[in-house]
From Swiss-Prot:
The modification Phosphothreonine is found at T31. The lineage of its organism: Eukaryota, Metazoa, Chordata, Craniata, Vertebrata. Substrate binds at L124, M159. The gene is AANAT. The keyword Cytoplasm applies. The modification Phosphoserine is found at S205. This is Serotonin N-acetyltransferase. GO terms for biological process: circadian rhythm; melatonin biosynthetic process; response to light stimulus. Induction: Exhibits night/day variations with an increased expression at night. Higher levels in pineal gland in early morning than in early afternoon (at protein level). Pathway: Aromatic compound metabolism; melatonin biosynthesis; melatonin from serotonin: step 1/2. It catalyses: a 2-arylethylamine + acetyl-CoA = an N-acetyl-2-arylethylamine + CoA + H(+). The keyword Transferase applies.
Length: 207
């Protein structure tokens, strides 16, 4: 059985809807640091984990992915990751994998299912020096455009704490109810997002 093709991100203009702050294009070119958006590789794993550890442990005491799991996903499915680099420095990232069930399970935390049609977003984090600048919003919008342009991917899914539900709703995610995944004493809401609209945005931006 053939596996649907998935490709890594190609450089393309970033188009953001109104209400999403932080578009690099709104800054003057002569003051804009060199920005690069690209899929991550295993060589980026240490930098990813450093940002993730600082971002998550300070808030919840847990990391979504340990260093070995970061390397695992960046080896198996780098095309489902996205990093934002400023002057060559990683400042924000998203790591995802494919999932093939309607809802997330405990297994979904560590598995990549190549035949899946769902992009499972495991982690989104921004370096502490670049927070409160809208970079998480820009990166998430860019990622959804990228994932929506993949023939194999039809929707995105993630789990988040209740306080973050309104943030993800701004990007087209809808609550699907309590998530079956539990991490320690933490519980989560599962969020689903159809990528059809994001695919259209990606096609238009490529013209």
């Amino acid at each position: 059985m053939s596996t649907p093709s998935i490709h890594c991100l190609k450089p393309s203009p970033l188009h953001l809807p109104s209400g999403i702050p932080g578009s690099p294009g709104r800054q003057r070119r002569h003051t804009l640091p060199a920005n690069e958006f690209r899929c991550l590789t295993p060589k980026d794993a240490a930098g990813v984990f450093e940002i993730e550890r600082e971002a998550f442990i300070s808030v919840s005491g847990n990391c979504p992915l340990n260093l070995d799991e970061v390397r695992h996903f960046l080896t198996l499915c780098p095309e489902l990751s996205l990093g934002w680099f400023v002057e060559g420095r990683l400042v924000a990232f998203i790591i995802g994998s494919l999932w093939d069930e309607e809802r997330l399970t405990q297994e979904s935390l560590t598995l990549h299912r190549p035949g899946g049609r769902t992009a499972h977003l495991h982690a989104l984090a921004v370096h502490h020096s670049f927070r409160q600048q809208g970079k998480g919003s820009v990166l998430l919008w860019r990622y959804l455009q990228h994932a929506g342009g993949q023939p194999a991917v039809r929707r995105a899914v993630l789990m988040c704490e209740d306080a973050l539900v309104p943030f993800y709703q701004r990007f087209g995610f809808h609550p699907a109810g309590p998530c079956a995944v539990v991490v320690g004493s933490l519980t989560f809401t599962e969020m689903h997002c159809s990528l059809r609209g994001h695919a259209a945005l990606r096609r238009n931006s490529d013209r």
